[in-house]
């Protein structure tokens, strides 16, 4: 015996959204942003390998005060992070000379950092006098690299200060 079964009809709603197509300009902009992000990541990784992982850098940065690194950061920021100018070299040489002539504790602790930065980032030999002016070339990549590196240095200084405070509270 068979019974007829009535089934409800299923309603299917198709929700078609209009597809947004990416323009050529938008595509190029997106690709440039992705490339910039990968460059930033690469700069950070290279900086970590060449400086942060090395004992010499850790020892130099450990003692500098936050006020000194902030001052140095603002000097570079004022120069738009272009380290190719003589102004930065003059600033570093002045800080090293001031440390030798004054008894400022902050400068005394910052001197090794200034010497390290001058030697490894600018190629300055503090034992020799400055003789010639540099030829300044400004590129977006170099400025971006300098800004990222100095931001990483500043962050590492903050890390060292926080670590010191935690260790002193733990004892």
Model region roles, listed by residue range:
Residues 1-171:
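Small/polar/charged residue-enriched interaction surfaces, especially the RNA/DNA-contacting tracks
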